[in-house]
Amino acid sequence: MEQYSEACIEACIDCMKACNHCFTKCLEESVQHHLSGCIRLDRECADICALAVKAMQTDSPFMKEICALCADICEACGTECGKHDHDHCQACAKACFTCAEQCRSMAA
């Protein structure tokens, strides 16, 4: 496996962890209605990151397309999470944008 795919795999795993943590923390908030977009995108993002990791590890013929979609979803999740002041949302946004950048490189 090439070096750049290892970096992308690491970014996807980090993003998946950050999204899962953010998802859990958002559900613990007393007022969740303003976090519904964040919660929904955390799930989507964690799922596509897991799929992207699997695609890279198995050298899927659809790896580039999956990584491109992963980048799009990570950007959407990062943008949504970045709207919220919670530390977990800000950390998630950062991980999402890092993952999006790595996945864009893989998809190129």
UniProtKB/Swiss-Prot annotation:
- Cysteines engaged in disulfide bonds, as pairs: none
Stretches of the chain forming a coiled coil according to its record:
none
The record, for CDD domains, names: DUF326
InterPro entries hit by this protein: DUF326 (IPR005560), YHJQ-like (IPR044543)
Task: Tell me where on the tree of life, at the top rank, the source sits.
Answer: Bacteria
UniProt-listed PANTHER family:
CYTOPLASMIC PROTEIN (PTHR37310:SF1), CYTOPLASMIC PROTEIN-RELATED (PTHR37310)
What's this protein's name?
A: Uncharacterized cysteine-rich protein YhjQ
Q: Which organism is it from?
A: Bacillus subtilis (strain 168)
